[in-house]
From Swiss-Prot:
Alphabetical list of InterPro entries matching this protein: HD (IPR001356), Homeodomain-like_sf (IPR009057)
Gene (name only): hbx12
Record lineage: Eukaryota, Amoebozoa, Evosea, Eumycetozoa, Dictyostelia
Protein's name in the database: Homeobox protein 12
Predominant localisation class: nucleus
Biased composition (Acidic residues): 524-546
Length: 846
């Protein structure tokens, strides 16, 4: 018997309890690599093994799984690929010794030297050619022979253990009980004192009891796996002869709830009627660290527990044992011809990346993840690494069940839908209705994207449903409606319906042209107001859709329900999201808007609103304003003031107030005031020009995207608003300067009066001011007087301007705040007296 292996591995077991042949690689002087074939030899546990020469490698980090890489000169006893190998430093190994007698099958307690070997990952060779990566198992006990670990025996109980002397002669009889290793030697042992490594010490580092019966059970399990096959691959000829069929179910998948206890479980595909025990591994390294102890306590010998032949399942909590559900494996394959369907089964399984054979499923060994462990991203390998954390991406891919309905000479793979023609009345285009495909899963998933689009699922019964399952009757009804609506626009590009190639449902451009043509027809009918003709055309189109499938009758109730839910009837390939009646809805909305506008034009209230808005805009553009355009400040309108100009200068006010600039003190103050005032005016004008430029740029950008929303009158009103706002700011600055200059006027008059008394009378009479001049009031010129008089006449019913109006009036006619208020108060008093006199004349009162 020959076997093909992809990794440098070997396996020892007893074939006495197996009725089937199995590909086992044993001790060989040449080894095997790649695809080399090697004759296998079955040996027992008590047979002598050859001693390999260890190969030195680097020391692995703490908490990592260990594996020993051996040379090919001797026996490769470690089950594991070289790609996933981590080794310990090179240590001189002693010649191997024969294993103990069959009466003493239990492992003696050992103390590990600084080589921190705790466990190994291994790989199991199978006879499946499609197996691209190894299946991970725990390292079996006899594999410790080839490990580069130094093991020393503990001293007798009467001898105290110390850090300086910890070596005991190798002739010490082994105890009858194996205990977990918790004491690590801190000093190196001379090579001469290193004892022989026992065959069955591998599981001692994991804390298990071990016997020969357990090894035989493992071998028997391995034989059953190879004999029964996976139900999909090369084992179709044998798997029906035995009830122990394996189809990896979701119930035996790795449970996330075990993370919180820090324990992993070996997920062996064990049948329900099998007596092979399930072995829990040691506490997961890295999840829960043991409690720290002092160095003296760690060096104390551990007490010997009672003998125990089976794995220590009793020591675990009962709730933790219940979390590990019993594995139930079902083979849902209906093979009508087991001799002729091997190729068909392999092809169907290879087409769907989520049909994973049982033997290609990696088994969780419960050890820390190896950095070079295979990833689930490669779907060609069709395995799942339970060491990797389960995420949404790989968990959905795991939950796919291996349920195929394989018939004679039938290559249709229902997991990958090939016949998607909606107008094809072939009955083969149906979902897989396998009655055995009913599994209780925690999360519902679809087989692939096409099944999700068509609403086909695995018919899983679960409490938390991710997607709403559609019944078979609703699916048929939707398919019938879809065919009636889209068969005219369907273009079959797949050729043969049974070829299995995917097709393109239809061309989106052609669909758009059909909608566009229908839209034009609807517009022509709307212009003529022929609603009856539109209904007749729609009925004709429905008749055409009925005739496309050869159906003479059509269910009107289903058609009405479809018309009410046309927005949800989207095309299945997700290439177009526009409903069938999308353009019809738009035309109806446009028609309703036109009717509303036509109704508003006849309404008198609507006409009044239009006229009022038109007049409101003309108020800002019909009259000249300050700087040719003043506009509004906020919602206030100052256009009625009829400002022609606003000169931002203080010279006119200084001249009219007759301020004497010959005084050095007054002159210095005026010059300083002018400097600050001119700086503020320049800053305000710059800001105004920037605002106007921004408004112009925004208008230009808006016209490139759409038609201008504002006409010339609206744009002019916006400009007036900007001009009026900054003009008001300048007016405030000018009035504040007037107030400062007005306070300097008495000082100027006093200086002129005192200066005339000091100097000659000629100078005083010629250029100075007399005492009478100091008391004289300022009179306005004709221009300013006519302006303020007109404003007062226009507002005679309420001659009390607001603050903004007062500021602008003061800036226009060069009056300070005090002079302006005085003028308005005097004007109102004179007007009041004048009205009283006129009233007395009318009534004849003397």
């Amino acid at each position: 018997m020959t076997s093909t292996a992809n990794n440098n591995t070997s396996f020892y077991c007893n074939n006495n309890n197996s009725n089937n042949n199995i590909n086992i690689n044993c001790c060989s002087n040449t080894g095997h690599n790649g695809n080399n074939t090697t004759e296998t030899t079955l040996t027992t546990v008590n047979e002598e093994r050859c001693a390999p020469t260890p190969t030195p490698t680097s020391t692995p980090p703490h908490g990592s799984a260990l594996n020993i890489q051996n040379s090919n000169n001797g026996c490769n006893n470690i089950i594991g690929s070289s790609s996933n190998t981590l080794s310990t430093p090179s240590v001189q190994a002693t010649p191997p010794t024969p294993p103990p007698s069959s009466s003493s099958l239990l492992v003696q307690p050992m103390i590990v030297t600084p080589s921190p070997v705790v466990a190994t990952t291994s790989s199991l060779i199978t006879n499946d050619d499609n197996l691209n990566s190894s299946t991970n198992y725990l390292m079996l006990p006899h594999q410790a022979q080839s490990s580069a670990m130094t093991i020393v025996q503990p001293p007798p109980p009467s001898t105290p253990l110390s850090s300086s002397s910890t070596v005991v002669p190798a002739s010490t009889p082994p105890p009858s009980v194996m205990t977990p290793i918790t004491t690590i030697q801190t000093t190196a042992t001379p090579p001469s004192l290193q004892p022989t490594i026992h065959h069955q010490t591998a599981l001692s580092f994991l804390g298990y009891t071990y016997n020969e019966q357990y090894q035989q059970n493992i071998c028997q399990l391995y034989h059953q796996l190879n004999a029964n096959g996976n139900g999909n691959g090369n084992g179709n000829g044998n798997h029906n002869n035995n009830n122990n069929n394996y189809n990896y179910n979701n119930n035996s998948f790795y449970q996330h709830q075990q993370h919180q206890h820090g324990l992993y479980y070996n997920q062996f595909p064990i049948p329900m009627n099998s007596s092979v025990p399930i072995i829990p591994t040691q506490q997961y390294i890295g999840t829960k660290q043991p409690q720290s102890q002092s160095q003296s306590q760690q060096l104390q010998p551990q007490p010997q527990p009672q003998p125990q032949l089976q794995p220590q399942l009793q020591s675990q909590p009962q709730s933790q044992q219940l979390k590990r559900k019993e594995a139930s494996y079902h083979n849902n394959n209906n093979n009508n011809n087991n001799n002729n369907n091997n190729n068909n089964n392999n092809n169907n399984n290879n087409n769907n990346p989520y049909n994973r054979p049982t033997k290609k499923i990696m088994v969780s060994q419960g050890l820390p993840p190896i950095s070079s462990s295979p990833s689930f991203q490669n779907l060609n390998n069709k395995y799942f690494d339970f060491n990797q954390p389960i995420t949404r991406n790989n968990y959905n891919q795991v939950n796919y069940n291996n349920n195929n309905n394989n018939n004679n000479n039938n290559n249709n793979n229902y997991n990958n839908i090939s016949n998607n023609n909606p107008c094809n009345n072939n009955n083969n285009n149906k979902p897989n209705n396998n009655p055995n495909n009913n599994n209780s899963n925690s999360n519902k998933t679809y087989i692939n994207k096409q099944h999700r689009d068509y609403g086909y699922e695995n018919n899983n019964n679960n409490n938390n449903k991710t997607f709403q399952q559609t019944s078979q009757q609703q699916q048929q009804q939707q398919q019938q409606i879809y065919k009636k609506q889209n068969c005219n626009n369907y273009i079959d590009e797949s050729g043969d319906d049974e070829s299995g190639e995917e097709y393109q449902n239809y061309q989106p451009y052609q669909q758009y042209q059909n909608f566009k043509q229908n839209n034009k027809d609807n517009n022509n009918n709307d212009d003529d107001d022929d609603d009856d003709d539109d209904e007749e055309e729609e009925e004709e189109e429905e008749d055409d859709n009925d005739n496309c499938n050869g159906n003479d009758s059509y269910d009107e109730e289903n058609n009405n329900n479809n018309n009410n839910n046309n927005n949800n009837n989207q095309f299945k390939n997700e290439s177009i999201i526009i409903g069938d009646n999308y353009y019809e809805i738009i035309n109806d909305r446009i028609k309703s808007i036109k009717q509303k506008l036509h109704f508003l034009e006849k309404n008198s209230k609507f006409q009044w609103i239009r006229e009022k808005s038109f007049n409101f805009i003309n108020e800002f553009t019909g009259e000249s304003v300050v700087n040719e355009e003043l506009g509004i400040r906020g919602s206030k309108d100052f256009s009625y003031l009829k400002y022609k100009t606003l000169n931002p200068s203080l010279d006119n006010y200084i001249t009219q107030e007759r301020i004497e600039l010959k005084n050095p003190l007054i002159k210095a103050n005026i010059e300083k005031l002018k400097k600050d005032f001119n700086f503020e005016i320049t800053k305000i004008n710059t800001t105004k020009s920037e605002s106007l430029e921004i408004m112009k740029s925004i208008q230009q950008l808006s016209t490139t995207v759409r038609s201008p929303l504002l006409d010339r009158s609206d744009l002019k009103a916006q400009r007036n608003h900007i001009h009026g706002f900054f003009t008001l700011i300048i007016a405030h600055q000018k009035c504040l300067s007037f107030d400062f200059i007005y306070q300097m006027r008495p000082q100027s008059m006093d200086h002129q009066h005192g200066f005339s008394n000091t100097f000659t009378d000629d100078f005083t009479n010629g250029g100075g001011c007399s005492i009478s001049d100091k008391k004289n009031r300022r009179t306005l010129n004709d221009q300013y007087k006519s302006f303020i008089s007109d404003y007062f006449k226009n507002h005679s019913d309420h001659p009390y301007p607001n603050e903004d109006e007062k500021i602008i009036i003061s800036a226009l006619i060069d009056l300070s705040k005090y002079q302006r208020n005085n003028w308005f108060s005097n004007k109102r008093s004179r007007e009041k007296n004048q009205r009283i006199v006129n009233l007395k004349k009318q009534i004849g009162f003397h």
